[in-house]
Amino acid sequence: MLKSNSVYAAGGGAGSTPSRTAHVEAKKKTQAGWKKQNGKWYFYSSDGRKLTGWQTIRGKRYYLGKDGAKRTGWKKIDEKMYYFGKNGVMRTGWKRINGRKYYFGKNGVRSTGWRKIDGKKYYFGNKGVMRSGWRLIEGKWYYFGKGGALRTSQWIGNYYVNSKGEWVSQPSDVVRLNVKNILQRPELPMGCEVTSLTIALNYHGYNVAKGYLSDNYLPKGSSSSTSPDEGFLGNPRSWSSWYCYSAPIVTCANSYLESVGSDQRATDLTGTKFDNLLYLLDDGKPVVIWGTLSMGSPRTNGRWYVGGRSYPRYINLHCMVLTGYDKKKDLVYVADPLVGNVSYRLSTTRVRYAQMGSQAVVIR
């Protein structure tokens, strides 16, 4: 006999009615997504389950604890540190937190130690804080700029850091770089500056010819309207021309380097003490300098007056490339575009360099 309080679904057997099933499904749907319960946020799947662990929700990464609660702030997961914003989203890239800078990889892991980012090197302490200024790391001193990038191959005040970023207290006693010389003549009878630049560029792996640089990138002008600080006076291909100083050579070099998509640049070191150039050689970088022919005493023949300024007209000014030195022997090694690879007295070269305005250019 059928009891009056029993309910049978269509098709036979006791169970939920269609209306009850619809009610349950509707309840599940209302639970899907983020829900705040007792002050904490949880995420429910479409079937009503509370999710836990790593979850990607609408393209954002979250971490939900074992209890399903959304995590915010710092969180150590599998021995790695992550940071989640107030909204629970995992942070990546550069982030400033409580006044300190951190870097999180694409996977969200906080960086520590050395890290290369967008072509620059940075250092992060054990707690992930980006370092700046002078830092002693594994027994060596390094300098990091205000933005945190490691400084290399340059002077920081009175201290030199090499291409690895390491502070060099004193350059080696003897250095000799393997620099191939190029002669300026016959094509460029007056082109010692642009030929010296070509020597330096070739050393750094740029297959460029002296004539190409001279014709296409070297600023030029006449001695009546152009100073040697602005451009080459005349044309290096002409015997009746003069010379230029460091600035036009830097312009020439950087115009070329930009045209070939290089990240390297020429730096005008004019004013740098001669002995400080030895650090660059010790760092593997030849240096273009201005001196005199055979390091003889400077000789002039009148002056130029351009733009309200007076310039001595040197008749034995010469540009060459420093390729090494030997302190004990008082020698510098030079790639001279007029005579080839030669050596001069270091002490004499120091004086001539100063007399010619302490002009120097380096590629780095």
Task: Please tell me what each predicted stretch does.
Residues M1-S172:
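Extracellular adhesion/carbohydrate-binding repeat motifs centered on closely spaced tryptophans
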Residues D173-L177, M190, Y279, G284, ...:
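Long, domain-scale functional regions
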Residues R303-G307, R313-Y314, M320-R364:
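Noncatalytic regulatory segments and standalone regulatory/sensor domains
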